[in-house]
Every structure is written in structure tokens, then in C-alpha cells.
Amino acid sequence: MRVNNRYVSFYYENDMDMGEIVIDKKKTALLVIDMQHVFITRPVYENPTEEQKKEAQRWEPFYQKIDQVVVPNNAKLLKAFREQGMEVCFAKIQCQKKDGSDRSLDQKATGYNELLLPPGTPSAEIVPELAPMEDELVVTKTTDSVL
């Protein structure tokens, strides 16, 4: 399957099983998923402990990739879709209830996935560079997966 010939690895050079992909502007949408402060903005510590400094250093390559590749590429896609009048949709994790009682079991459990993002929480908002415009769909979900 190839969308175009510019970004096809030589591995797929002769793969024509799926043929050309035709993008029908009326049937195609861009779905931007979880581009929220809580996931893609570096945490800020007032007086970081040594452990927090080490953890920040460990995560720095991730945040650099977010800043230099993920956000700019999402912004380019958003611009292109909007200029073409194509549908743009967003999905974000956020509770519907302030106490978070509607969260998934994963996000209620303690540990890695524990997350409480009630309505109005700044960290739940989509970063400004990728923010939805008026009349764009935003689906609020209470767990990690959107599909």
C-alpha cells in the first residue's frame, strides 16, 4: 500500500498489492489523538529532587521528539486539512465528572496509568499549537484507547 512515492521505503518498492490510495476529501478526516499538556508538555518542578532531575533527563529525548517532530507534523496536517476544507477531529482523555468516578478501571488504579483529569483541568487541554477551532469535533474519552 502506498500513499505516494516520496516516503516509501525501498523495502516496499515493488509492493503494489493495494494499489494507489485515493483520498476522497469528503470521506476523509484527520483524527488528532491525546495531544494534551499532560502527555506532551515537560513537567515543571519548583525545587526538583535529584530523582526528578534524573527522570527529567531520561524523558528529554521523548520531549525533544514531541517538540521537533510530533507537534510540527500535526500542525502541518491540521493546516493542510483545514485549507482543503476537510474534516478535523480530536480525541482527548478527560473525565466527565469532577470526582473522576467515570474513569476507566485502568485510570482509577494506582500506578502507571493512574490519571485524573476532571473538566476544566489545564493539563487536560489540547496544546495551543494544535487546538481545535470552532466547529471541529472533540471526542472526550475516559480511557487511553480512542478506537
Predicted ranges, named:
Residues 1-132:
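Active-site acidic carboxylates
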Residues 137-147:
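Glycine-rich oxoanion-binding loops at beta->alpha junctions
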